């Protein structure tokens, strides 16, 4: 068969197969063009899920009449002019493929007016066939109409889903955009009816976060903001107990561009580690900012993916930032309301990095809807170091420390003193710590405590398990991983890529407890293994570690295996169900929870405590109605 030059229309239709997957792809490309043009308001009109009509109207800079035909030509763009521009591109679009690709598979109309022009101009394209530029009344800005998407490519049109499904994809992308660009007003209508409006606001305002991901996420989000090595990571991560069955609330933006990146997703999952219940997914909205020259955005035609020039550094930066933020969450801590004072300050965090820099105790804001006294828990700090693994070892000290003095009213009325019970005189006592004071034990499993806001219920085994686990980890971290030499070196047959990785990462492997030398093109000599994991399967473990090093530049397999062992030890050492605790012992456990990192979840990701405010309890009994 002879080689022939393809016609321009067919070339554009082939390109549309990569750029225009469904109506949501069209909306994405057109709205990104509007934002690159400086628009502060974008109206999106849809019919039949975007298949019959997509109309995007913006108030951006507009296009000159003589540039309209050029705007729908392949690889014509105002955003880059050289390779240097491509390597440092900061705009959302730059390839010059979207408009001609969309126009080749639809009935397309482009109308625009510059702010200094007397009137607008319009250009119609029918299935890739270019019309004439004609004058048309139009407000400053640009309107793009896309009718009958894929009308001339029936094979593509039959693969489109139901109207509701296609509309859902558009709405999901608009949610992602609304999180990244809160300064832009977005108005959406479907089949002639308004369906969504995102009002302009501040990045750290609760309005945009709440209306996109829900008020529950906004209440449970920890704000993070950390910079270093020319990188900045800021945004929100949900507390571990706010987890999802799917990845539907995971948003990553690199220099303002919504992307998917396996390395960053892996770093986030690692950071949640042993605080996330099995099979659950974390929720987050993260913005990573770095020099555009350090990231390649010209990887995918739809620009969904990026390639970092320092992938290992990015992975480690994200992991350590989020791990630090999550590590400093403690039982009794409620994230600050997003709309509270300092909400507009990127450095103001809720249990995140901004708080932990200056204090060992996070800021304890009042829970939303609580009927407490408004006492600022940030003023309360434990007055002693944490206990050992057994809560009864210092019960006398705790009893003396936390027993409130009798009030003068009690003494004058002849009422018995509450000293020695571990209970405050009233629930509104300004000295009440976050988890309050124990009042009873329920079925030998749960501790019931009263704090300034209401009732606290603690799973005593889960809580004590986490306390012991964190102490075991800290003890082992202080002495490091010891290597245990093998009497007979083990020869391991591996692939050539694995052998190259082992040779290149010899120093990293040594810090993990492995002493490895290359024995041949596809074999390794293993002379020592981590002592703590001597009874594990070193061959399988080493293969997993090498796979992680090759894929992500680092591995936590050893640490994870060690943590699993320590978790088992802590579980066996924790207080068991049906063991009766005295009130001072229960108070000792509560104080240790408040001083222990990640104490909101046990080693397996289950919650260790729950709060019921007075407002919640009042609703149970219909009080105040």
Swiss-Prot record:
Region Disordered: start-end pairs: 333-356
Gene3D superfamilies from the UniProt entry: 3.30.230.10, Histidine kinase-like ATPase, C-terminal domain, MutL, C-terminal domain, dimerisation subdomain, MutL, C-terminal domain, regulatory subdomain
GO biological process: mismatch repair
Matching InterPro entries: DNA_mismatch_repair_CS (IPR014762), DNA_mismatch_repair_MutL (IPR020667), DNA_mismatch_S5_2-like (IPR013507), HATPase_C_sf (IPR036890), MutL/Mlh/PMS (IPR002099), MutL/Mlh/Pms-like (IPR038973), MutL_C (IPR014790), MutL_C_dimsub (IPR042120)
GO cellular component annotations of the record: mismatch repair complex
Cited SUPFAM superfamilies: ATPase domain of HSP90 chaperone/DNA topoisomerase II/histidine kinase, DNA mismatch repair protein MutL, Ribosomal protein S5 domain 2-like
Domain of life where this protein originates: Bacteria
UniProt keyword terms in alphabetical order: DNA damage, DNA repair
Residue spans of biased composition, Gly residues class: 341-356
Example of a GO MF term: mismatched DNA binding
Family: Belongs to the DNA mismatch repair MutL/HexB family.
Reported function: This protein is involved in the repair of mismatches in DNA. It is required for dam-dependent methyl-directed DNA mismatch repair. May act as a 'molecular matchmaker', a protein that promotes the formation of a stable complex between two or more DNA-binding proteins in an ATP-dependent manner without itself being part of a final effector complex.
Xref: PANTHER family: DNA MISMATCH REPAIR PROTEIN MLH, PMS, MUTL (PTHR10073), DNA MISMATCH REPAIR PROTEIN MLH1 (PTHR10073:SF12)
Protein name: DNA mismatch repair protein MutL
Lineage, top ranks: Bacteria, Pseudomonadati, Pseudomonadota, Gammaproteobacteria, Lysobacterales
Name of the gene this protein is made from: mutL
């Amino acid at each position: 068969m002879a080689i022939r030059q393809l016609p321009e229309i067919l070339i554009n239709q082939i390109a549309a197969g990569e750029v225009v997957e469904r109506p949501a792809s069209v909306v994405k490309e057109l709205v990104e063009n509007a934002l690159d043009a400086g628009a502060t308001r974008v109206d999106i009109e849809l019919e039949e899920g975007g298949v019959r009509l997509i109309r995007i109207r913006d108030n951006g800079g507009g296009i000159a009449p003589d540039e309209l035909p050029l705007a729908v030509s392949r690889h014509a763009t105002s955003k880059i002019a050289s390779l240097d521009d491509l390597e440092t591109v900061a705009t959302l679009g730059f390839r010059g493929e979207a408009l001609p690709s969309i126009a080749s598979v639809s009935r397309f109309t482009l109308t625009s007016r510059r702010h200094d022009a007397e009137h607008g101009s319009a250009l119609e394209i029918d299935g890739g066939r270019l019309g004439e530029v004609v004058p048309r009344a139009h407000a400053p800005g640009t309107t793009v109409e896309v009718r009958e998407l894929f009308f001339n490519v029936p094979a593509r049109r039959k693969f489109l889903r139901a109207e509701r499904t296609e509309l859902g994809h558009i709405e999901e992308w608009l949610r992602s955009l609304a999180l990244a660009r809160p300064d832009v007003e977005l108005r959406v209508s479907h089949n002639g009816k308004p369906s969504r409006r995102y009002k302009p606001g501040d990045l750290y305002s609760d309005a945009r976060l709440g209306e996109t991901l829900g008020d529950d996420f906004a209440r449970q989000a920890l704000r993070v903001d950390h910079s270093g090595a020319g990188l900045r990571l800021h945004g929100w991560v949900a507390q571990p107990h706010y987890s999802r069955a799917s990845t539907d609330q995971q948003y990553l933006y690199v220099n303002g561009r919504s992307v998917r990146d396996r390395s960053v997703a892996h770093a986030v999952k690692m950071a949640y580690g042993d605080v996330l219940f099995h099979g659950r997914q974390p929720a987050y909205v993260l913005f990573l900012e770095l020099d555009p020259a350090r990231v390649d955005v010209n990887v995918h035609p739809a620009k969904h993916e990026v390639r970092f020039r320092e992938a290992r550094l990015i992975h480690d930066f994200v992991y350590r930032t989020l791990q630090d933020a999550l590590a400093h969450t403690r039982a009794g801590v409620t994230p600050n309301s997003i709309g509270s004072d300092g909400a507009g300050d990127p450095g103001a965090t809720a249990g995140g990095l901004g708080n932990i820099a200056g204090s060992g105790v996070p800021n304890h804001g009042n829970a939303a809807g609580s009927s407490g006294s408004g006492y600022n828990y940030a003023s309360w700090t434990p007055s002693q170091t944490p206990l050992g693994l057994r809560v009864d070892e210092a019960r006398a000290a705790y009893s003396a420390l936390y027993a409130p003095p009798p009030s003068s009213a009690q003494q004058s009325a002849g009422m018995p003193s509450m000293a020695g019970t571990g209970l405050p005189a009233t629930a509104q006592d300004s000295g009440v710590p976050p988890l309050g004071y124990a009042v009873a034990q329920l079925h030998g499993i749960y501790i019931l405590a009263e704090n300034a806001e209401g009732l606290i219920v603690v799973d005593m085994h889960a809580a004590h398990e986490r306390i012991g686990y964190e102490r075991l980890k800290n003890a082992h971290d202080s002495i490091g991983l010891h290597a245990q030499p093998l009497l007979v070196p083990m020869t391991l047959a591996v692939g050539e890529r694995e052998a190259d990785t082992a040779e290149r990462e010899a120093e990293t492997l040594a810090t993990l407890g492995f002493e490895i030398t290359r024995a041949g093109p596809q074999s390794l000599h293993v002379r020592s293994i981590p002592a703590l994991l001597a009874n594990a399967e070193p061959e399988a473990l080493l293969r997993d570690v090498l796979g992680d090093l090759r894929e992500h530049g680092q591995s936590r397999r050893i640490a994870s295996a060690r943590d699993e062992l320590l978790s088992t030890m802590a579980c066996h050492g924790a207080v068991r169900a049906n063991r009766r605790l005295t009130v001072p012992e229960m108070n000792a456990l509560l104080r240790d929870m408040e001083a222990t990192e990640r104490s909101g979840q046990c080693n397996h990701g289950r919650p260790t405590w729950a709060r019921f405010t007075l407002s919640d309890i009042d609703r149970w009994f219909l009080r105040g109605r």
